[in-house]
Regions:
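Extracellular glycan-recognition surfaces and repeat-rich motifs
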Residues: 27-53
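Extracellular carbohydrate-recognition regions
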Residues: 10-36
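Short, aromatic/His-centered strand-loop micro-motif at the edge of beta-sheets
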Residues: 124-147
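Short tryptophan-centered beta-strand motifs in secreted/extracellular beta-sheet-rich domains
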Residues: 24, 69-71, 144-153, 157-159
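Beta-strand-rich interaction surfaces with strong enrichment in secreted/lumenal proteins
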Residues: 55-61, 134-140, 183-184
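Flexible glycan-contacting loops in extracellular carbohydrate-active proteins
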Residues: 169-195
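C-terminal motif of bacterial Sec signal peptides marking the signal peptidase cleavage site
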Residues: 6-7
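Secretory/extracellular carbohydrate-interaction modules
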Residues: 51-122
Length: 204
């Protein structure tokens, strides 16, 4: 099993403030992101990645404890596998192509060759109902744009897809604080596109 790996410690990132938005209407990633593999790129106003092998693109902003995240996601691959990480450490990445131990929660739609969607607390291959919750009844349709909305309030993490509750996860010891305060885009092999990222702090 490959542990998430952190290289040299990065300077402390600024807080989110009340909100953060990114429509990717530019040519380069810019200073707001840390690319752990050097393969993330912006094409025609959208963020694109494939073959990242669990090397995230981290947003250089610290998340508040309670937060709402919205974004549009599309896969051009039949394998689906659209993925983000939240409340991670902002710098870790997989050292090899073995099982990945994330530093935060992993949210994935159409993972494992489009057979499973899940919320996982660090362990993508963890115990159902303990480390993760999942469903197998939904397949990602290639080239279809999905709108994701994720809410973390207290011990509850809720994930909505196109306005409908998709999965929820209850965590008695929610990840938060230093080492668990960043958002990241992630990927295995699929050709995935992201757009219209919005992150907003919620009241306690």
């Amino acid at each position: 099993m490959a542990l998430g790996f952190a290289g040299c410690a990065l300077p402390r990132d600024p807080g989110l403030g009340s909100k953060f938005r990114d429509d990717f209407e530019r040519t380069g990633l810019g200073k707001n992101y840390f690319d752990t593999i050097g393969r993330y790129r912006i094409i025609n106003g959208k963020l694109n990645i494939e073959k990242a092998y669990n090397n995230p693109l981290w947003l250089r902003r610290r998340l508040p404890r309670n937060v709402e995240i919205e974004l549009d996601v599309m896969s051009r691959s039949k394998d689906g596998d659209m993925k983000i990480e939240l409340f991670g450490d902002g710098e870790s990445f997989a050292r090899d192509r073995g099982a990945y131990v994330a530093s935060g929660y992993v949210i994935c739609m159409g993972g494992w060759h489009n057979t499973k969607s899940f919320i996982a607390r660090r362990l993508e291959h963890g115990r159902e109902g303990i480390d993760m919750v999942s469903r197998t009844d939904v397949k990602v349709v290639p080239n279809k744009v999905y709108h994701w909305r994720i809410l973390r309030q207290g011990k509850e993490l809720r994930w909505y897809v196109d306005g409908e509750l998709f999965l929820s996860y209850h965590d008695e010891e929610p990840l938060y604080g230093r080492g668990h305060d960043h958002f990241g885009f992630n990927n295995w092999e699929s050709d995935v596109w992201y757009d219209n990222l919005r992150i907003e702090a919620l009241s306690d």
